[in-house]
């Protein structure tokens, strides 16, 4: 006895967007069962069972190396902007490697980062 799949096609991960999730119902219909009762010969057909599930799928990833940019977002989340290499949440900005909460800024040798201390205007750290 084989069951035919009535499931929707699976989600396909693509580079854009960087986060994707799916909730898709899946239903399988199996063939009917037949029983012969003797004597006298009587045929009774029982409907095949319907099996259902609700699989969940989620993927979060990166589309590759972020582009270097500038401004309020470097573009928003990459580059040298609000969430990227030199911005409010990235490599050299407000929350990144050289910024407010990251590796070399107001948070590395500063508030909330790897060390304790501060960062001067010249870029040198105090007591880290």
Curated annotation (Swiss-Prot):
InterPro entries on file: Keratin
Residue spans of the Sequence repeats: 83-91, 92-100, 101-109
Region span, 3 X 9 AA tandem repeats, Gly-rich: 83-104
Keyword annotations: Keratin, Repeat
UniProt key word Repeat: yes
GO MF term set: structural constituent of cytoskeleton
GO cellular component, one term: intermediate filament
Origin superkingdom: Eukaryota
Note: The avian keratins (F-ker, S-ker, C-ker and B-ker) are a complex mixture of very similar polypeptides.
Record PANTHER family: BETA-KERATIN-RELATED PROTEIN-RELATED
Similarity section: Belongs to the avian keratin family.
Name of this protein: Claw keratin
Taxonomic source organism: Gallus gallus (Chicken)
